[in-house]
Amino acid sequence: MTMSIRIGNGYDIHRLVSDRALILGGVHIPHELGLLGHSDADVLTHAIMDAMLGALSLGDIGHYFPPTDPQWAGADSLVLLNQVNELIRAQGWRIGNIDSVVVAERPKLKPHIKTMRDKLANVLQLEPNQIGVKATTNEKLGPVGREEGICAYAVVLLVSSDPVN
């Protein structure tokens, strides 16, 4: 059976620490804490990449960019996102739309959402209106609510570029 659309979902969480930049959707967010990770720890971009890969049953970002590989240390997640986008395009698919949510108690992310959407759209060769980015809190519940980390969820709709796919 052939399908012309595929849907994937993604999730990522990283711990908040001092002496690290806070980068979400490729945007540097002013904050006294940043996210700890092997790359730049951009949870939003990581969740989107996992959703893209998951839609095509291609595994997760750890398979392509393992945290044990020194070449990805400090990597810009937008560069990795571009590589994942090239991979799905080579498989005959393109993004129809993305919906995502970042969960953080602080800082307030609303002032940065348009810039996040614009940066992601530029890398993915999409229009900003194809990318939804929302922000919410965890109402002080769990590790995100205690400000121990930030997480993100993403859903991606892929559309076949090939009518026989």
From Swiss-Prot:
It is an enzyme of class 4 (lyase). One of its GO terms (molecular function) is 2-C-methyl-D-erythritol 2,4-cyclodiphosphate synthase activity. Binds 1 divalent metal cation per subunit. It catalyses: 4-CDP-2-C-methyl-D-erythritol 2-phosphate = 2-C-methyl-D-erythritol 2,4-cyclic diphosphate + CMP. 4-CDP-2-C-methyl-D-erythritol 2-phosphate binds at residues 12-14, 38-39, 60-62, 136-139, 146. GO terms for biological process: isopentenyl diphosphate biosynthetic process, methylerythritol 4-phosphate pathway; terpenoid biosynthetic process. PROSITE patterns: ISPF. The record marks 38, 137 as: Transition state stabilizer. Its EC number is 4.6.1.12. CDD domains: MECDP_synthase. Keywords: Isoprene biosynthesis, Lyase, Metal-binding. Pathway: Isoprenoid biosynthesis; isopentenyl diphosphate biosynthesis via DXP pathway; isopentenyl diphosphate from 1-deoxy-D-xylulose 5-phosphate: step 4/6. The keyword Metal-binding applies. It comes from the Bacteria. InterPro entries: MECDP_synthase, MECDP_synthase_CS, MECDP_synthase_sf. A divalent metal cation binds at residues 12, 14, 46. Its cofactor is a divalent metal cation. Involved in the biosynthesis of isopentenyl diphosphate (IPP) and dimethylallyl diphosphate (DMAPP), two major building blocks of isoprenoid compounds. Catalyzes the conversion of 4-diphosphocytidyl-2-C-methyl-D-erythritol 2-phosphate (CDP-ME2P) to 2-C-methyl-D-erythritol 2,4-cyclodiphosphate (ME-CPP) with a corresponding release of cytidine 5-monophosphate (CMP). PANTHER family: 2-C-METHYL-D-ERYTHRITOL 2,4-CYCLODIPHOSPHATE SYNTHASE, CHLOROPLASTIC. Belongs to the IspF family. NCBIfam families: ispF. Homotrimer. HAMAP family: IspF. This is 2-C-methyl-D-erythritol 2,4-cyclodiphosphate synthase. It comes from Trichormus variabilis (strain ATCC 29413 / PCC 7937) (Anabaena variabilis). The lineage of its organism: Bacteria, Bacillati, Cyanobacteriota, Cyanophyceae, Nostocales.
